A protein has these predicted regions:
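Extended catalytic core of nucleotide-activated donor transferases of GT-like folds
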Residues: 30-113
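Conserved catalytic-core segment of nucleotide-activated headgroup transferases in glycan assembly
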Residues: 2-11, 131-198
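Short acidic alpha-helix that forms the nucleotide-activated donor recognition element
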Residues: 53-57, 194-204, 224
Length: 307
């Protein structure tokens, strides 16, 4: 959904960048027409077909997902005939997950044109990342802020714990312990849901537990929907302030030791609302839609955070 947000907000800035905006599948990936798991009117085009149809271009900017950089280096190397029709090529790497940048040859893109990198998390929007990727880097911080959600209160919540689908060595152990010690709590691992079904589920769920990167949709969206989310602190994605949240643990061992008792302790209106509000306020400051939009405008003006 982050790519969709980037696409839709970029279209709104046409008066700034003066360009047509299309969304394309990554060359070599299986073709598909649109994202089917959430409502949208955005169709996915074939990049090679688009470029052939365009003919001569004064300028082309390609936003490239972090995990597909090497694929694009190969594709661009084999597509020299298409590139001859482009006067100026700008390649921007979308660093949605800093861990997925490992092994990706970002500077290898420089043989084709100018290269930049945009970051999605504040935790790695820094000079260290700029030096690691070797190209100008900009804090984009794509997000869907709190204003897009309608949180439900404690009294409207069900005894339901939603769990991210991520694989993790502690997952089975943690879930078995919760199920054994809290038999009245229903546990649902997210799988096979549309986005609307997921959104409905987290509005009903009291609790959420992510085994992913930490500051991800399985942590953020439940909080914005009125739930309390549990995670283990991951310095690569969380900023230090999140370590102060009572449901963000310093390690998986400590989560395993405390989570059952914390669920029991928080399962009454006053404690629940206090714990939820603490996380909600921090996330609302951290994930600001207007800041993302201003960051996007700065990017298209060529005003980068770490030039």
């Amino acid at each position: 959904m982050a790519i969709t947000a980037l696409y839709e907000e970029t279209r709104k800035l046409q008066s700034l960048h003066n360009a047509e905006v299309v969304m394309c599948s990554v060359p070599g990936d299986p073709p598909f027409l649109k994202y089917a798991w959430f409502k949208n009117d955005n169709y996915i085009l074939d990049l090679e077909s688009v470029l052939k149809r365009c003919g001569h271009l004064n300028h082309l900017l390609l936003h490239i997902p972090d995990y597909r950089v090497n694929r694009l280096v190969e594709w661009l190397s084999a597509s020299q005939a298409l590139l001859k029709n482009i006067e100026e090529l700008h390649l921007n790497v979308l660093a949605f997950n800093i861990d997925l940048m490992q092994g990706q040859n970002v500077t290898g893109l420089e043989q084709f044109g100018s290269v930049t990198c945009t970051t999605a998390h504040q935790a790695y929007s820094n000079l260290t990342t700029r030096e690691a990727v070797g190209v100008a880097t900009h804090s984009l911080l794509i997000c869907k802020g709190a204003e897009f959600y309608s949180p439900t209160g404690y009294e409207d919540k069900e005894q339901l714990l939603v769990v991210s689908p991520d694989a993790h060595p502690f997952k089975e152990l943690v879930l078995q312990q919760i199920a054994r010690e809290l038999p009245g709590l229903r546990i649902q691992v997210i799988a096979g849901l549309t986005y609307d079904e997921f959104a409905s589920l987290i509005r009903r769920a009291k609790w959420s537990l992510t085994f992913g990167e930490g500051l991800d949709g399985f942590f953020v969206e439940p909080v914005f929907s009125g739930s309390i989310s549990f995670a283990v602190f991951n310095e690569r994605f969380f900023t230090p302030a999140f370590a102060d949240l009572e449901t963000v643990y310093p390690s998986w061992d400590i989560l395993l030791e405390r989570i059952v008792e914390d669920i029991r302790r928080l399962d009454e209106p006053m404690a629940y609302n206090q714990g939820w509000q603490q996380a909600y306020d921090l996330l609302s400051q951290h994930l600001d839609t207007n800041r993302f939009r201003e960051n996007l405008r700065s990017f298209y003006r060529g005003e980068y955070t770490f030039p």
